[in-house]
Every structure is written in structure tokens, then in C-alpha cells.
Amino acid sequence: MIYIAHRGNIRGPNKEFENRVEYIQSALEQGYECEIDVWFDDQRGWLLGHDYPQYPIDFKFLLTENLWLHCKNDRALYQLSKHTKTK
């Protein structure tokens, strides 16, 4: 069975911490997979946040094992598609 921490939450909603890198990493370290909300902005780059882009991140973070990426805008989906390997 796979347990997925929604936005890093493992004990119910916590809007103060969800989608923050440290919170997500803590859930991963405890054995959970994590769904995260990903945005891309042409000026600000990659960001996490549910209702709006809040927390800047490096693209390499998105390559972390056991993350489920929820693209929150079309730019995020487009940018991710440029990094997808196809056969």
C-alpha cells in the first residue's frame, strides 16, 4: 500500500506548512510519498503553493523520488513536458 501525504500533510491539513520543502522532506523521510502543487512563472521560475505560487524551489527538487506533481498552471505542465524523456 502507498501512503501519499497531500502537500506534505500526514496528520490533516496544516496550511502554515503545507507545500514547504522542509515539510515535504519530513514526510518523505517518514516513508510517505507526497503530492505537491507546482507552478512555473517565467520571471520567478519554479514555485510551490496551493492557491497561488508561494515558495521558490530549484527544479532539481522536482526530481526527488516519491513526489507526485500536481501542475497548478499550464506553464508548469509545459515546462515539465520539456524535461520528459520519450521513447
Go through the PLM ranges and name each one.
Residues 1-87:
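Phosphate-group recognition and catalysis centered on beta-loop-alpha active-site segments
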